[in-house]
A protein has these predicted regions:
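Peripheral, non-AAA+ core regions of ATP-driven protein-machinery
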Residues: 1-218, 222, 228, 331, ...
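Short beta-strand elements
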Residues: 18-24, 283, 387-390
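Hydrophobic residues in beta-strands of the RecA-like P-loop NTPase core, especially within AAA+ ATPase
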Residues: 105, 158, 284, 304-308
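Catalytic P-loop NTPase motifs of RecA-like helicase/translocase cores
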Residues: 111, 305-312, 355
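Conserved alpha-helical scaffold flanking the Walker A/P-loop in AAA+ ATPase domains
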Residues: 208, 265, 270, 280-303, ...
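Walker A/P-loop
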Residues: 219-260
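Walker B catalytic acidic pair
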Residues: 300, 306-307, 318
Length: 512
């Protein structure tokens, strides 16, 4: 007897429909799973057999063939355990076939309980778009799956496979779970406050510009100057996530298996801080089974690279594509996958190997050639993609013990939100599709929105010729100047806007 159960799998960041077909026929007792299953899917036969027996069902003492269609796409993970069990029981005549518009996801324990699986949100979104009206998932995945409900699909949380069978039989119905209200502003309360940072007015200003325009930042300073403190506080002044950004970020974290249990959407902008020993694969993603790397896990948030020159050259060069394109493509023998990587890079480095080159009181033990060698580990093309660079001096005693209070994150956030509102209004016009901050302007769009006063234009020409700027560096200076002008409420870029943008140039501060 033949039966088919609807389920879904993952291909990169998106789900795809899978038909779990089962056929119970005469022959020697055996279970064969075909349709390009990986090892986890092949092992599911043993889990399903034990779960069926422990739930009180009779396992068919015949030949069982299970096909996962389409057969030309590789199937990974234990997500097919529950639909495989239902397909076998239905094919053996022990339960009625579920309605065609019903789908199932979930891993089975040996006692028949359901365990959470990765990637539920993208699969649930595909299910809703495919006309599924009822989706049964493990209870711990239900809040996440409910974010895909819409008006046509209901999500049913289950703790065991027996609950699913009883619900299908009408014995014990399961109440569907509702989508939780979306409120990303609560994330601001959890972020550390800028009021804790003493001194460093130029670096604080750079962080405001970074948040207001979506720019990348490099902080250079001796140990203890506050580089890490500033980086960790940047998410607290960024605008709240939109629902579209939250869905995209949640899909990434769900696929990576990093969603907290029982959570719906990710409402906090990510802050990722990989160690400098991180490999290129851990940053880019990939592996035997495609998984997002740190560049994608920082999507819509902040990627903080402390001790930047200590990263391997291969790891740093991985950053070039996502910084330029906002996405990263991972290619392996089994195929390729593209993940979004719209992150803000905040990098920090010491001025030299010992950390005290140029320090006012502590002597540097590095030779000039050693300092040059240390700084040369950060390539010119990578520096060309960093908009803001700040050299940070040690904090003076009077600044640490002064009575003047520093601006709080709430104060800085108001400035950032004002500038973002200006940009949102500007980029709502035709020709700016996909642009929501100054840092994402293309070269052609920069010409449209970065109009200057005559004096500012003369200053830019002189700077371009004197500093030997590249075309990319020229455009990045204009983007930063546009952000400075937006914070000040100016329509045209004036000399002050350009001068402030020029002082943040990274190339001259890193290269000796």
């Amino acid at each position: 007897m033949y039966s088919v159960i609807r389920s879904f799998g993952l291909n990169g960041l998106n789900g795809f429909a899978v038909a779990v077909e089962a056929d119970v026929s005469g022959g020697m007792p055996a279970l064969s799973i075909v349709g390009r299953p990986d090892s986890a899917v092949r092992e599911s036969g043993d889990r399903v057999h034990a779960a069926a027996r422990n739930l009180g069902f009779k396992w068919p003492d015949r030949r069982i063939t299970v096909n996962l269609a389409p057969a030309d796409v590789r199937k990974t993970g234990p997500v097919y355990d529950l639909p495989l069990l239902l397909a076998v029981l239905s094919s053996a005549g022990q339960i009625e076939p579920p309605p065609e518009e019903t789908a199932f996801l979930g891993e089975l324990a040996l006692d028949g309980s359901l365990r959470p699986v990765s990637g539920v949100l993208p699969m649930a979104l595909t299910a809703a778009a495919s006309g599924v009206q009822a989706l049964y998932v493990p209870a711990e995945n239900a809040a996440e799956a409910a974010e895909a409900c819409g008006d046509t699909m209901l999500v049913y949380p289950a703790h065991t496979a027996l609950e699913v069978v009883d619900a299908l039989r009408g014995i014990r119905p399961i109440s569907p779970i509702r989508c939780a209200p979306f409120d990303p502003t609560d994330a601001w309360n959890a972020a550390p406050d800028f009021a804790d940072v003493m001194g460093q007015p130029l670096a604080r200003r750079a962080m405001v510009l970074a948040a207001a325009g979506g720019h990348n930042v490099l902080l250079i300073g001796a140990p203890g100057t506050g580089k890490s403190m500033l980086a960790k506080r940047l998410p607290g002044i960024l605008p709240p996530l939109t629902r579209e950004e939250a869905v995209e970020t949640t899909k990434i974290y769900s696929i990576a298996g990093q969603m907290p249990k029982g959570r719906g959407l990710v409402t906090v902008r990510p802050f990722r801080s990989p160690h400098h020993s991180a490999s290129a694969v851990s940053l880019a993603g990939g592996g035997a089974q495609f998984r997002p790397g740190e560049c994608s896990l920082a999507n819509c948030g902040v990627l903080f690279l402390d001790e930047l020159p200590e990263f391997s050259r291969e790891s740093l060069e991985v950053l070039r594509q996502p910084l330029e394109d906002g996405q990263i493509t991972v290619s392996r023998a089994a195929g390729s996958a593209t993940y979004p990587s719209h992150f803000q890079l905040v990098a920090a480095m010491n001025p030299c190997k010992c950390g005290y080159y140029g320090h006012p009181t502590r002597p540097c033990t590095c030779s000039l050639s050693a300092v040059r060698q240390y700084r040369s580990r950060v390539s010119g093309p990578l520096l060309d993609r960093i908009d803001l660079c700040v050299e940070m001096d040690p904090v003076a005693f009077d600044e640490l013990h002064g009575t003047a209070s520093a601006e709080s994150s709430a104060d800085l956030r108001r400035q950032v939100l004002f500038a973002r509102q200006v940009q949102a209004k500007r980029y709502a016009a035709p020709g700016f599709e996909g642009v929501h901050c100054n840092a994402r302007l293309t070269a052609g769009q920069v010409r449209r929105v970065c109009r200057m006063t005559p004096a500012a234009e003369r200053l830019l020409r002189a700077s371009y010729e004197t500093l030997g700027l590249s075309a990319r560096a020229h455009d990045r200076i204009l983007r930063v100047a546009r952000t400075v002008a937006d914070l000040a409420g100016k329509q045209l870029l004036d000399e002050d806007s350009l001068l402030e943008a020029l002082q943040y140039r990274a190339q001259e501060k890193v290269e000796l």
